[in-house]
Design a protein with these regions (language model features):
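C-terminal structural segments of small proteins and small subunits
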Residues: 53-80
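N-terminus-biased detector of the onset of the functional/mature region
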Residues: 1, 44-56, 80
Length: 80
């Protein structure tokens, strides 16, 4: 699980052998949320409100690079 960024204590990670939709794992202490890279919504999990806003803003600003990373680490998933 490469963590590709740490922002204000939030680890932004992309896993290999993961599942669709393309997403990142945002981890902050005991909290973890999966954020859809395209839709910018939480698929599952939870983060404190202020940390959720920071993580979602990061995903929005880096959407294309995150999609590329997701598909590189998950070559068996067809790009949509």
């Amino acid at each position: 699980m490469p963590c590709i960024q740490i922002i204000k204590g939030i680890r932004i990670c992309v896993y290999s052998n993961d599942h669709v939709p393309p997403h990142i794992h945002a981890i902050y202490g005991e909290y973890e949320a999966l954020i859809d890279i395209r839709e910018l919504n939480i698929i599952t999990g939870n983060l404190p409100s202020n940390k959720r806003k920071i993580a979602t803003a990061y995903v929005e600003e880096n959407q294309e690079d995150l999609l590329e990373t997701f598909y590189e680490l998950n070559p068996n998933i067809q790009r949509i």
